[in-house]
């Protein structure tokens, strides 16, 4: 892989709480405590551009480990210090590490931040904007960034907007185009908002070669004793029914944002086998896509 070729590195693949999750004794969490290979950090991506720029998507509580994973993938000795940070929304797991860029830890100054007005507002209210300078946006106010042969375009999607709005991000290089969709409420609302009747047509219209897709829950019975309508996400079962088989022509589907309860955390589960048979993948940290 060309050292200066724009490249995406997966730094985390779990829902906001990670795997293992605090206070949980489920089989997935116990397995992750006992075997670090079963552990998952909250969802995050690192993108290097062809000018040496480094762009972080999501700032999680696992930021120190993720910056070193990114460095290792890029052949660097020291942890990456990003040139920009992009945020899809303001739910806890996606911004929990944002304070580490401040004077208490990394001491960054004038670090470019790419996020929506409502996300910026949340950070300002929590006094977390001091290390950052807000990126210039397009005339309609939609966040975007273009640098070093890589372009980041934000797409609004419906998702529990109790603290901020939510965006997917299209990451485009010369060779590949990746849709990053870690969070949305359900396919009906999302497809209506983007103007398509099924995800396959939407992916094709975007020109996506890869889709990093919300796979929080396997089905609607996963959270025992909790009302799952309070944490809306499309189930993997529903997604599989809508997305064409991976052996057919279309983008590569990589499932991310797994809740700790999801049976896909167990590589030997029948559900994991179903994903393999369908021609899709369950994301792992350290995976790379040359853009």
Predicted regions and their residues:
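Residues at the starts of beta-strands that form the adenosine-phosphate
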Residues: 7, 53, 110-112, 177, ...
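Cap/insert and terminal regions of metallo-dependent hydrolase folds
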Residues: 177, 185-288
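Active-site-proximal loop/helix segment associated with metal-binding centers of metalloenzymes
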Residues: 13, 17-47, 136-227
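Extreme N-terminal starter segment of soluble prokaryotic enzymes
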Residues: 2-9
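Metallo-beta-lactamase
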Residues: 108-166, 174, 278-289
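Metal-dependent catalytic neighborhoods of phosphoester/phosphodiester hydrolases
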Residues: 96-106, 263-272
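Pre-active-site segment of Zn-dependent metallo-hydrolases
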Residues: 19-90, 96-105, 188-201
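Active-site neighborhood of phospho(di)ester-bond hydrolases with catalytic His/Asp-centered motifs
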Residues: 56-60, 81-94, 98, 114-116, ...
């Amino acid at each position: 892989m060309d050292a200066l070729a724009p490249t995406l590195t997966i730094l985390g693949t779990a829902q906001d709480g990670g795997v293992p999750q605090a206070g949980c004794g489920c089989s997935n969490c116990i397995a992750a405590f006992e075997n670090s290979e079963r552990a998952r950090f909250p969802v995050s991506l690192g993108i290097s551009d062809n000018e040496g720029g480094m762009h972080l998507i999501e700032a999680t509580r696992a930021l120190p480990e993720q910056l070193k994973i990114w460095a290792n993938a890029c052949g660097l000795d020291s942890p990456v210090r990003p040139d920009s940070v992009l945020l899809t929304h303001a739910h806890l797991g996606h911004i929990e590490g944002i304070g580490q860029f401040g004077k208490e830890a990394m001491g960054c100054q004038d670090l470019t931040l790419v996020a929506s007005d409502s996300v910026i507002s949340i950070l300002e209210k929590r006094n977390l904007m001091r290390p950052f300078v807000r990126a210039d946006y397009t005339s309609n106010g939609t966040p975007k960034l273009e640098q070093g042969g890589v372009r980041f375009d934000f797409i609004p999607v419906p998702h529990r907007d109790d603290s901020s709005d939510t965006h997917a991000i299209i990451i485009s290089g010369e060779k590949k185009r990746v849709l990053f969709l870690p969070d949305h409420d359900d396919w009906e609302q999302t497809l209506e908002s983007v103007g398509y009747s099924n995800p396959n047509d939407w992916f094709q219209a975007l020109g996506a070669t890869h889709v990093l897709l919300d796979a929080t829950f396997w089905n609607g019975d996963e959270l025992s004793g909790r009302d799952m309508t309070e944490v809306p996400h499309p189930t993997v079962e529903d997604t599989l029914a809508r997305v064409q088989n991976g052996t057919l022509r279309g983008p590569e589907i990589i499932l991310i944002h797994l809740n700790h309860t999801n049976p896909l955390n167990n590589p030997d589960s029948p559900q994991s086998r179903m994903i393999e048979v369908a021609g899709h993948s369950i994301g792992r940290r350290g995976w790379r896509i040359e853009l």
